């Protein structure tokens, strides 16, 4: 052949393609497939009430400043017009106005955003307007979901922003824009991760990750000829998208996940999907004997791999994630908080999207406790920053929204803590302490059904 590759006897199919999953995640997938959880949904026993049906959807813009962060939440603009693009333009104007009036920053200081759409049909239109907010490299990390009628009558878009009030030169970003075998390139104007200084460590905001195959940028699925069930395809996607989160976290030197949200879409077998997501999350935070033995094995350096003909030895050894770093955990609890949240739609028609907050730190203390209406987990980072997750059990649905408001007031009224509330029930119009993410259902650890889940970020109480 005339080509250089032909003269060398190399064909495209001879070039090594990395496996889709690393060793640790491949092992986790095999374990899931070997013992699938029982499929037992309980939607029939749930109340039919949701935010749209309640007639009490009245989202108020919320602003909080704490821990060097300024959060601006629940911005809508139905008055700008019926079209999603028009409303995103209205939201952009409101965001710029708030930032300019404060004198505390500009849109260049936004490090994370949550975009809630009425429908994913509007994804491309909203993306075009949203991109106009950010002119510099490393735009904010982002999570985008569709909530349907839960946004309220006439509302096509709602956006919330996290603004870093610290020096710009101390931020770090990861913005992957080209295809590779490592992790998906972004499918919109966002960074995969943004990292900011928090005390003596760093907070790392990771964009929502869906199960795209990095090389093709198509949703992962098993070969149809293999006769795989929806369950096997879903398990592949839930593991792959979590691997994306892990790889980005590792690249950003995350030591520990403060918490994670597994956004789910679809209508059938949702309890099973939530339990599967929990099981893989738990699995990846279980330290086994093999990992402890790995710590004592010598690591091959680059010379050995390239010139010492020991690359195969390195390739055969199971890849173990650098996350989690158990050395920083100063408590018996070892699995970070987890919520699974059912929404109407996710980007690209995905049925799973992982979104997490990581930290680079020297010390983490995790304290679980039972409270009046459910369960609470406090995670204190470097004795400075507190991340709290509160679960309100489905059996306490009758206390929402009044009881939920009391919980928020208790934690936020005098501390300027920032709250994110995931719920299928209406909140009072006076809710002004944080961000609302309306959803169809929510689960916590072990796939327990919840009436609401609350995430709080604040300075550790003195």
Give residue spans per PLM region.
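Short, polar/acidic, helix-capping and beta-turn segments at strand->helix junctions
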Residues: 1-462
């Amino acid at each position: 052949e005339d080509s250089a590759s032909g003269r060398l006897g190399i064909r495209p199919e001879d070039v090594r393609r990395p496996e889709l999953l690393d060793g640790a995640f491949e092992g986790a997938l095999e374990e899931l497939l070997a013992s699938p959880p029982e499929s037992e949904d309980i939607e029939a026993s749930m109340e039919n009430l949701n935010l749209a049906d309640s007639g009490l959807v009245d989202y108020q813009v919320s602003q909080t400043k704490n821990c060097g962060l300024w959060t601006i939440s629940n911005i809508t603009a139905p008055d700008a017009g019926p079209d999603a693009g028009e409303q995103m333009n209205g939201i952009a104007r409101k965001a710029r106005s708030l930032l300019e009036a404060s004198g505390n920053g500009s849109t260049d200081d936004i490090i994370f955003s949550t975009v809630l759409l009425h429908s994913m049909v509007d994804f491309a239109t909203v993306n075009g307007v949203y991109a106009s907010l950010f002119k510099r490299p490393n735009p904010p990390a982002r999570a985008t979901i569709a909530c349907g009628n839960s946004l309220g009558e006439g509302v096509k878009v709602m956006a919330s922003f996290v603004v870093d009030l610290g020096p710009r030169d101390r931020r770090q970003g990861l913005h992957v824009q080209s295809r590779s075998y490592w992790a998906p390139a972004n499918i919109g104007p966002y960074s995969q991760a943004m990292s900011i200084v928090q005390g003596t460590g760093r907070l790392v905001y990771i964009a929502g990750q869906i199960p795209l195959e990095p090389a093709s940028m198509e949703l992962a699925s098993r070969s149809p000829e293999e006769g795989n069930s929806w369950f096997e395809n879903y398990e592949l996607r839930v593991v792959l998208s979590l691997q994306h989160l892990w790889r980005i976290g590792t690249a950003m030197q995350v030591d520990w996940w403060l918490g994670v949200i597994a956004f789910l879409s679809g209508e059938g077998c949702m309890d099973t999907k939530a339990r599967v997501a929990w099981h893989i999350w738990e699995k990846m935070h279980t330290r086994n004997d093999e990992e402890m033995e790995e710590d004592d094995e010598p690591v091959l350096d680059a010379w050995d791999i390239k010139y010492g003909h020991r690359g195969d030895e390195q390739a055969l050894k199971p890849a173990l994630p650098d996350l989690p770093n158990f050395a920083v955990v100063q408590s018996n609890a070892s699995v970070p908080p987890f919520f699974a949240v059912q929404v109407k739609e996710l980007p690209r028609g995905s049925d799973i999207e992982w979104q997490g907050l990581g930290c680079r730190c020297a010390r983490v203390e995790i304290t679980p406790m039972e409270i009046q209406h459910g369960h609470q987990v406090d995670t204190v980072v470097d004795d400075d920053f507190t991340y709290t997750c509160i679960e309100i059990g489905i059996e306490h649905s009758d206390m929402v929204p009044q009881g939920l408001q009391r919980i928020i007031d208790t934690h936020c009224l005098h501390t300027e803590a920032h709250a994110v509330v995931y719920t299928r029930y209406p909140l009072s119009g006076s809710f002004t302490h944080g961000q609302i993410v309306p959803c169809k259902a929510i689960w916590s650890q072990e796939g327990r059904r919840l009436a609401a889940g609350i995430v709080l970020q604040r300075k550790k109480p003195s």
